[in-house]
A protein has these predicted regions:
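Conserved catalytic cores of phosphodiester-cleaving nucleases, focusing on short active-site segments
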Residues: 35-37, 41-52
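Beta-rich catalytic cores
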Residues: 31
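Acidic-basic catalytic patches of nuclease active cores, encompassing PD-(D/E)XK
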Residues: 1-26
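Intrinsically disordered, low-complexity terminal regions enriched in charged/polar residues
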Residues: 92-185
């Protein structure tokens, strides 16, 4: 609600290529993440966290969750993500981070290049730093893009050009040319 018009427009691009979003049974259990996003070209789990502090350190159960997501990502060739909400922020309060997974292919690999990894503490433990994450509206705009979406957009643009510009010109030419009208009558 408090996002700018630009942020809202970028986020709404996802409506062109939506996902089926499933709340994982036993959310918070190891390896599943809280949400599973599914679409024909890509699938990924998301672990959701929120805090009033910009930095959220993982420890105990949350480190085990991270390690389980890492293991599932490796075994299943999936790219898990964290969605981190900073409470009390106006505008886009969500930031996206990825769990580091090696050997991804296809769209998962492209997506992994765009999203920052969870930073590490001095002792190597991952944590969430809101300032270092990718804003949710940018993440949504990126995953909404695809070749088929671009093709749909270009086909729609071509139809619009034809219907708004070319078709009226053709109709105008057909109706204003006496030779055209006479030849079309003699052909019938």
């Amino acid at each position: 609600r408090s996002c700018s018009e630009s942020e809202r427009a970028q986020a709404m691009q996802i409506c062109q290529r939506p996902f089926l979003v499933v709340r994982a049974p036993g959310s918070g259990s190891e390896g599943t993440g809280d949400l599973l996003l599914l679409r024909g070209d890509i699938c990924f789990p998301i672990e959701v966290k929120s805090s009033k502090k910009k930095k959220l350190y993982l420890s105990g159960r949350t480190v085990l969750q991270y390690q389980a997501l890492e293991e599932i990502g490796r075994r299943c060739s999936l790219q898990p993500f964290y969605a981190y909400r900073l409470k009390g922020v106006r505008g886009d309060s969500w930031r996206i981070f990825r769990v580091k997974i090696e050997g991804l292919t296809g769209k998962s690999r492209l997506l992994a290049r765009r999203v920052p990894e969870l930073p590490l503490t001095r002792n190597g433990t991952p944590y969430l730093d809101w300032d270092k994450g990718l804003p949710l509206h940018k993440f949504l705009a990126f995953i909404a893009k695809s070749e088929s979406a671009k093709n749909i957009e270009s086909n729609m643009a071509a139809k619009k050009v034809y219907s708004e510009i070319l078709e009226p010109l053709i109709n105008q030419y057909d109706s204003s040319s006496p030779d055209r009208a006479a030849s079309s009558l003699s052909n019938s």
